[in-house]
From Swiss-Prot:
PROSITE patterns: G_DYNAMIN_1, G_DYNAMIN_2, GED. It is found in: Cytoplasm, Cytoskeleton. Residues 36-43 are annotated as: G1 motif. The modification Phosphoserine is found at residues 579, 599. It comes from Saccharomyces cerevisiae (strain ATCC 204508 / S288c). The keyword Cytoplasm applies. Residues 178-181 are annotated as: G3 motif. Belongs to the TRAFAC class dynamin-like GTPase superfamily. Dynamin/Fzo/YdjA family. This is Vacuolar protein sorting-associated protein 1. Residues 26-336 form the Dynamin-type G domain. GO terms for molecular function: actin filament binding; GTP binding; GTPase activity; microtubule binding. It comes from the Eukaryota.
Amino acid sequence: MDEHLISTINKLQDALAPLGGGSQSPIDLPQITVVGSQSSGKSSVLENIVGRDFLPRGTGIVTRRPLVLQLINRRPKKSEHAKVNQTANELIDLNINDDDKKKDESGKHQNEGQSEDNKEEWGEFLHLPGKKFYNFDEIRKEIVKETDKVTGANSGISSVPINLRIYSPHVLTLTLVDLPGLTKVPVGDQPPDIERQIKDMLLKYISKPNAIILSVNAANTDLANSDGLKLAREVDPEGTRTIGVLTKVDLMDQGTDVIDILAGRVIPLRYGYIPVINRGQKDIEHKKTIREALENERKFFENHPSYSSKAHYCGTPYLAKKLNSILLHHIRQTLPEIKAKIEATLKKYQNELINLGPETMDSASSVVLSMITDFSNEYAGILDGEAKELSSQELSGGARISYVFHETFKNGVDSLDPFDQIKDSDIRTIMYNSSGSAPSLFVGTEAFEVLVKQQIRRFEEPSLRLVTLVFDELVRMLKQIISQPKYSRYPALREAISNQFIQFLKDATIPTNEFVVDIIKAEQTYINTAHPDLLKGSQAMVMVEEKLHPRQVAVDPKTGKPLPTQPSSSKAPVMEEKSGFFGGFFSTKNKKKLAALESPPPVLKATGQMTERETMETEVIKLLISSYFSIVKRTIADIIPKALMLKLIVKSKTDIQKVLLEKLYGKQDIEELTKENDITIQRRKECKKMVEILRNASQIVSSV
């Protein structure tokens, strides 16, 4: 069952490989990613785990593409002489016969003339299905060849992985992703920004939450300066998904060891550290086999005074077992999430494929008819609040128009104040002008109407502005509808629908504006002084009288009760010399010379201090203007939105389908309108590929 779990992830890796590998796959698979500097011994650790020399070697960047290494434990046939430890206590069977040992030392397993049944371990590449590599030197050459095929021979790098599966009775079932080694300085013809390129690639792999980071670090250098560990801590600062490997333990200075690191007293990691010993360059040149190196590693830890008591927690065999255990545990934890993610992603691409439409296109006429019908229905639905997808984040469609009506427009109307333009002197002047040559005995209706009509005209600007705002909102709905993928399929038709819709709105805006202006003119034309909500003139005069002459109630000093009011015995006001309409134009000096009459100035204004009567009349008119203006505000705030609903909004909802059919359906260029977008064609191919891959992935995980 445990091996089946890892095998399932291996199959998923292969299934998702066409998507560009682990860094670009939409599914975050649990995997162990191997990071470290070029000099950390990363490749040697992997070869020790496999028990074979198969990775490219050389100077500079050797690993230039991620290598997804899938190790499959293959039980040997009964006829084979090799004794394999099935309990996984040993990684490599050291009792292999002499003939096999000689083959290992030579590094050659010839494929020619030998049947598959005679071989116990081999490699297979995903890009070469069905071909088995028994010669591990050939595996190395194929890795180099496939790397150069994508990156070229100029030491460039690529994030597209190479998938290699190795079957052997001498390995534990395990999956590792070998990433390019970190480097500081470009060598040879490497790009000048090679350090940044490698770091960016590694971060794409190890940043994924389901990635276990295997950080390979040289023990004979300061751990705090380890490139691999520093990179791991960028994405995993707490060390919760990082395991450390300490190489070159045998090369440390005399009297030093890694006990403090192993105990977690330096840089603690959740999975801890495991010390190993690799072959040096001299060992490789002298053809020292990996089996011999593993035996030397075992003896080193068993005999070293610092490690002998913990030798069974050191070395490559323990590293392989621990990685196997970590990966299995990680897979068990993440598998439900992976299943859900695969199903959700599959559904997403299936829906997109449906929106993109099938490859076999219907007749041009039926396509145009279908698109116009869909557009008209969706437009009406958005206006009425019946859209398929209602947002919970922001207002849209008809709700935005309602906001424009009842918030934006109403606030604009309410903010109009007639007295920010009308001054008391203006009222005084109009009162005298409206009375003509004979002074008026009462507050003039003419002055009131003149002033009110002037102020009603001010409602025209915000009302016409409302037409523009509603126009913009309807265009916004248009853009919301045609932004859907199904409209992107036919860009010419989408553009035609958009243009015709906007032109329709522009045409409808003209009579709408005229209607709005007529409504304002109607309010100006007839001032309804009999309106039931209008303040009566007598009420206004009483209010002004109380304001100008507040009555003081006498109080009985003995009882504290108000005394009865005495009837007023006021006399007619005495007109002072300086009061009156013309008082401001003539000084006292001129009054004495009335015999010498002069012509009035060309521009004659009502100036000077107002009389008590003028003050009262002015205040009365102001009260009446304020009262009537409030009535007009309510009327305008109510009737103008209704006018727009009639002339623009409802008209567009009921007439747009008919207009679009008249303009677009059955025209000569209808074939051009239904020509598919190249982007749509390409996207459909991509979605079909994704659906196929994800269906395969879904079938793989459904068996677990």
